[in-house]
């Protein structure tokens, strides 16, 4: 019996518990027209664990913290569903690069470079916000 046993807050504060390793989260990905449908396989009936994001956003999310990439497993269910290769995501490539055209003979490239302005404007208007702020600052600076 310790001095702090009368106060449960202090007892829990000073008790040391061994951390359990985090379980591997299995994610199901279905690529469709430049967007990826992601859902957790652990709860297939729960729709709240489902999301649709773009290829580029998926690559950005998974490459933001490379230390956590080992905790993500990409699983494939079904013949017609395409899943993302984790190595491609590390490099920032999109998943629909491997898609074939209608005649199934030629590959079409649907990838964008990270500096492509069309892709940048399509998913984020950050550049226009930067331009507005810089214009506003220069206007305020010369107003004096």
Swiss-Prot record:
One of its GO terms (molecular function) is ribosome binding. GO terms for cellular component: autophagosome. It comes from the Eukaryota. GO terms for biological process: autophagy. This is Putative uncharacterized protein YBR285W. The lineage of its organism: Eukaryota, Fungi, Dikarya, Ascomycota, Saccharomycotina.
